[in-house]
């Protein structure tokens, strides 16, 4: 049986999602406006009939498709039945939704339907970006009379596989309430609009990488042969080829207001690069990944500094993580540390090849500077003060480097099915007496940062060319939602 004829096409579904979502947002904003200006309360009966709800998207497969695709990591059904999720910001996610629906519609003959859901849109998510202005005294009344965020309804049970497929079949890893929660947090933490985020993400833990990224990004925008057309900066700066003295415009301190500022090098087709300075520590690393994941990026890479643990390493050498010793502890409750985090072959190869291309060295010379192995991620910046215990554990793990973010980012990529990788640069060798001193640090930074960042950017170029092959089946659970 082919269900196409009795349901919506992907284009029709997207149109209906847009219409239903906009209808609810307008109704909620109008009701809030009336409450603010005249004290008029929202109509309870209208609310019960779905005045402020998210749209719901359902895709049904009857199981009759012969030879369904089995090699791709998404756009697949694990069993016949109906799969449902709620949708927010359909315009923001249009390209993603169209890709996912088209795969299921064309390859499975799936039936697509859109209708109002039972889940109301929390009022804070429609106020931001609107003309509505509130003072502190109004918040209690709004919370009492309008739908608001309820944390008990937000979670990662689907992404973590904590649901029973016979009772509920989710269409995607994140529903609308979870997505809206994270979209609001992303703007708060990074200081940039969520619309500017690009699908290829670099994380760093040092501001100097940001300076280099901005310099390179500005040069790309001015290059007529470059695909990059604009640079969106934390704090609100928007740089194009017409911007006078772009680096001076960016040099203000507005970005310092934000905990994890981001910069977005944008392409016309939305396939650019986002750089996030996550600072130091696994808590920030977990936080930013929790929220970035709802945008369904194509890859995230950690490009930062580490301590080298082997005598044969030199300051400025690179470490390509093949495995992780997770002493960060921030994810233990949802992803126990005894669960292995596999490396992603496509990402590993891209990082290695990019190192060869950027350094201009032949393979044997690259191997002298690029060490592969286990990276320790710790939540204790002063682990050296417990050297006896630390050294024994590191020795058992055969670790080659230590930092405070990489394993957390990789584990979050594993949880949320975002391809991940780590290329670190050795900035000190704490086990061998080579510690960072101010003068040495400055000389190291000046020589290493530009090449290291360029390797990350070149790796993204290689990964972008992979297309859908970048997404790995090894990250799928037994009952994976159809959407990526």
Question: What do these predicted ranges mean?
Answer:
Residues 1-299, 307-484:
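Accessory terminal and edge-of-domain segments that mediate assembly/interaction
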């Amino acid at each position: 049986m082919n269900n196409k004829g009795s349901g919506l096409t992907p284009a029709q579904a997207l149109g209906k999602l847009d219409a239903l979502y906009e209808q609810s947002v307008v109704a909620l904003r109008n009701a809030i406006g009336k409450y603010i200006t005249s004290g008029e309360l929202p109509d309870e009966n209208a609310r019960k009939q779905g005045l402020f709800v998210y749209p719901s998207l359902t895709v049904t497969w009857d199981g009759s498709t012969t030879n369904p695709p089995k090699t791709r990591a998404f756009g697949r059904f694990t069993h016949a039945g109906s799969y449902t999720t709620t949708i927010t910001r359909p315009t923001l996610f249009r390209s993603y939704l169209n890709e996912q629906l088209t795969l299921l519609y064309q390859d499975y003959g799936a039936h697509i339907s859109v209708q109002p859901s039972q889940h109301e849109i929390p009022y804070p998510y429609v106020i931001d970006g609107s003309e509505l202005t509130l003072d502190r005294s109004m918040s209690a009344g709004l919370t009492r009379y309008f739908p608001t965020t309820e944390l008990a309804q937000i979670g990662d049970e689907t992404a973590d596989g904590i649901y029973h497929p016979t009772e509920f079949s989710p269409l995607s890893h994140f529903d609308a309430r979870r997505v809206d929660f994270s979209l609001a947090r992303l703007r708060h933490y990074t200081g940039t609009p969520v619309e500017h985020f690009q699908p290829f993400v670099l994380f760093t833990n040092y501001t100097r990488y940001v300076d280099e990224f901005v310099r390179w990004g500005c040069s790309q925008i001015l290059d007529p042969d470059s695909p990059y057309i604009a640079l969106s900066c934390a704090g609100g700066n928007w740089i194009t080829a017409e911007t006078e003295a772009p680096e001076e415009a960016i040099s203000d301190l507005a970005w310092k207001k934000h905990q994890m500022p981001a910069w977005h090098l944008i392409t016309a087709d939305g396939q650019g690069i986002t750089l996030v300075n996550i600072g130091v520590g696994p808590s920030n690393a977990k936080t930013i990944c929790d929220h970035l994941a709802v945008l369904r990026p194509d890859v995230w890479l950690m490009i930062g500094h580490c301590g080298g643990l082997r005598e044969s390493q030199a300051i400025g050498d690179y470490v390509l993580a093949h495995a992780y010793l997770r002493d960060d502890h921030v994810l233990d409750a949802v992803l126990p540390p005894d669960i292995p985090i596999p490396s992603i072959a496509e990402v590993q190869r891209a990082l290695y090849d990019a190192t060869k291309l950027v350094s201009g060295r032949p393979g044997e010379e690259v191997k002298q500077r690029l060490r592969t192995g286990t990276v320790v991620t710790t939540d204790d910046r002063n682990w050296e003060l417990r050297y006896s215990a630390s050294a024994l554990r590191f020795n058992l793990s055969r670790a080659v480097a230590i930092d405070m973010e990489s394993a957390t980012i990789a584990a979050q990529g594993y949880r949320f099915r975002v391809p991940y990788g780590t290329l670190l640069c050795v900035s000190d060798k704490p086990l061998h007496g080579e510690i960072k001193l101010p003068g040495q640090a400055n000389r190291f930074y000046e020589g290493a940062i530009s090449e290291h960042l360029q390797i990350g950017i070149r790796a993204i170029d290689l990964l972008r060319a992979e297309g859908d092959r970048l997404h790995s089946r090894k990250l799928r659970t037994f009952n994976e939602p159809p959407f990526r």
